[in-house]
């Protein structure tokens, strides 16, 4: 997905907590669109192969949660994690990891991922169609910066991870912000 392109319009089927429902599963369906997530704000979107998978659960998502406040310091208003998983899986994953800041977006059918050009087969792992690992800075629905792991392909034997890490994105944003404002970075 080249920079300066608008994110595609997609409606996501989410499950949101609703205390008026009561019982052991107080959630209702809610449709949220890409406009709801991206319009009028500057956000980081990162996408990964799947909920509950090793790198995603032990490094990428926990690190974004831990570094969330650092993104606010460089003008990011929200951080979203998207995966080709349904709302039930994404909610259970967020609960299992104790997420409080990063918001999860369920791309159950893979429609958004396909329209972003990032849908790949992971049949070699028994996953079916999933997202390639990537991240983007999205400013008012337009891709401002793009971070894609190398080796994009179906049934990739490896699981590359660095370009879309929060550490790399923060470093890039800090450098970009410094250059944009004409500041010289201070090194200690």
UniProtKB/Swiss-Prot annotation:
Its EC number is 1.11.1.27. It catalyses: a hydroperoxide + 2 glutathione = an alcohol + glutathione disulfide + H2O. It holds the Pfam family Redoxin. One of its GO terms (cellular component) is cytoplasm. It comes from the Bacteria. GO terms for biological process: cell redox homeostasis; cellular response to oxidative stress; hydrogen peroxide catabolic process. Keywords: Antioxidant, Oxidoreductase, Peroxidase, Plasmid, Redox-active center. The active site is at 56 (cysteine sulfenic acid (-soh) intermediate (for peroxiredoxin activity)). Residues 2-152 form the Thioredoxin domain. InterPro entries: PRX5-like (IPR037944), Redoxin (IPR013740), Thioredoxin-like_sf (IPR036249), Thioredoxin_domain (IPR013766). Gene3D superfamilies: Glutaredoxin. The keyword Oxidoreductase applies. GO terms for molecular function: thioredoxin peroxidase activity. Coiled coil: none annotated. It is an enzyme of class 1 (oxidoreductase). Thiol-specific peroxidase that catalyzes the reduction of hydrogen peroxide and organic hydroperoxides to water and alcohols, respectively. Plays a role in cell protection against oxidative stress by detoxifying peroxides. Belongs to the peroxiredoxin family. Prx5 subfamily. Monomer. The active site is a conserved redox-active cysteine residue, the peroxidatic cysteine (C(P)), which makes the nucleophilic attack on the peroxide substrate. The peroxide oxidizes the C(P)-SH to cysteine sulfenic acid (C(P)-SOH), which then reacts with another cysteine residue, the resolving cysteine (C(R)), to form a disulfide bridge. The disulfide is subsequently reduced by an appropriate electron donor to complete the catalytic cycle. In this 1-Cys peroxiredoxin, no C(R) is present and C(P) instead forms a disulfide with a cysteine from another protein or with a small thiol molecule. This is Peroxiredoxin y4vD.
């Amino acid at each position: 997905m080249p920079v300066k392109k608008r994110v595609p319009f997609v409606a996501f089927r989410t499950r949101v907590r609703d205390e008026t429902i009561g019982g052991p599963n107080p959630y209702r369906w809610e449709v949220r669109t890409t406009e709801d997530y991206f319009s009028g704000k500057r956000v980081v979107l990162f996408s990964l192969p799947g909920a509950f998978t090793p790198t995603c659960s032990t490094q990428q998502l926990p690190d974004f949660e831990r570094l969330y406040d650092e993104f606010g310091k460089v003008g990011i208003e929200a951080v979203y994690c998207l995966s080709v998983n349904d709302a039930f899986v994404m909610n259970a994953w967020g609960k299992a990891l104790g997420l409080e800041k990063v918001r999860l977006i369920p791309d159950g059918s893979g429609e958004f991922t396909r329209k972003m050009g990032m849908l790949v087969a992971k049949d070699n792992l028994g996953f079916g169609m999933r997202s390639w690992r990537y991240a983007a800075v999205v400013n008012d629905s337009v891709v401002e910066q793009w971070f894609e792991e190398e080796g994009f392909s179906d049934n990739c034997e490896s699981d590359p991870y660095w370009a879309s890490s929060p550490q790399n994105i923060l470093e890039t944003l800090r450098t970009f912000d410094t250059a944009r404002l004409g500041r010289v970075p201070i090194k200690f």
